[in-house]
A protein has these predicted regions:
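Extended basic (Lys/Arg/His-rich) segments that typically form rRNA-contacting surfaces
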Residues: 1-189, 194-316
Length: 316
């Protein structure tokens, strides 16, 4: 029987293939927009709980299963509250001023917070083009860890400064953000460590009488040019890469106090959900307890936008 053949799947879109430097990827906020109708911030920090099966009612118009109950795989993300750490003022795409407005004790685990936070009213510069906020999660509300995660978020509002002033010192919840049915999920993939070129780049195995190894590339390149191209399939790091999954459908959300979805004994390798949660259709990159940043979808498709589902029951 002949062996199967396929092209190598080592995409050159992502390079260099090395471990990500940050747990939460940076975002190009110039392309992320909200609905344009309400004042909102454009990101939220969550933690991956795990996967399950959801029984949903398909409400999609002209769907083959319209009005019927169907099963689909879902991913559950826990979303504890967040707070504003500082307000950044920009001018000509450069940071003009960074005003720290919080010194919560949770921050002492990751940064050197000031003993006394500054007043935002007294520190507003005379001229600025844009402002963003640096928020930190409160993972002590979860069973994951105690160290908060910080990320810079953009804001969409008619009066951004007034909107930020209304949020300073208050806890931001998932309900304040969740106004979208499609979300982009940013996070790191599951780390695999050092792996060979067959698993990493998808090259084929050599014949059984081949010298110098079967799971190796046939050549590293010609004699001249006398250097090895970065396109050559070689062993190296696999996983722990920064990736974005686009147009993920929101199936449902809530809080544990309203509806408890914890299975008996808790979720495997995670524990029990203690705060708010969001249920997404399909799979999400990364292992359990990995940080996932939610942002509004910046290039939604008509097909995914028109799909509607009503959560009936979770089966975990």
């Amino acid at each position: 029987m002949a062996g199967g053949s396929k092209p190598r799947h080592g995409s050159l879109q992502y390079w260099p293939r090395k471990r990500a430097e940050k747990a939460i990827p940076s975002v190009n906020w110039s392309v992320v927009k909200g609905d344009g109708k309400t004042d909102s911030f454009l990101g939220y920090i969550t933690y991956k709980v795990g996967m399950g099966t959801a029984l949903v009612k398909d409400l999609t118009d002209k769907s083959m299963t319209q009005g019927k109950k169907i099963y689909m795989p879902v991913t559950i993300l826990e979303a504890p509250s967040m707070k504003i750490y500082s307000v950044r003022f920009y001018k000509n795409n450069k940071v003009l001023k960074d005003v720290v407005v919080s010194n919560d004790k949770e921050l002492r685990r990751v940064i050197l917070a000031p003993k006394q936070p500054k007043s935002l009213d007294a520190e507003v510069p005379k001229e600025f083009d844009d402002l963003r906020i640096i928020v930190f999660s409160i993972p002590s509300q979860t069973s994951v860890k105690k160290t908060p995660d910080l990320i810079e978020l953009a804001i969409e509002a008619k009066d951004k400064l007034a909107f930020v002033k209304s949020l300073v010192g208050k806890e931001i919840t998932l309900k304040d953000f969740l106004k979208y049915s499609l979300l982009d999920l940013r996070g790191l993939t599951k780390g695999k460590g050092l792996v060979g070129p067959v698993k990493r780049m998808g090259i084929g195995l050599k014949a059984h009488k081949t010298e110098k190894g079967v799971r190796r590339p046939g050549t590293l390149g010609p004699w001249h040019p006398a250097h090895t191209s970065f396109r050559v399939a070689m062993a190296g790091q696999l996983g722990m890469f920064s990736r974005v999954t686009y147009n993920n459908k929101v199936i449902g959300s809530g809080t544990i106090s309203e509806k408890n979805i914890n299975p008996a004994g808790g979720f495997k390798q995670y524990g029990n959900i203690r705060s708010s949660y969001i249920i997404m259709k399909g799979s999400v990159q990364g292992p359990q307890k990995r940080q996932i940043l939610l942002t509004p979808s910046f290039r939604p498709t008509k097909l995914t936008a028109k799909k509607k589902y009503e959560l009936v029951e979770m089966q975990l």
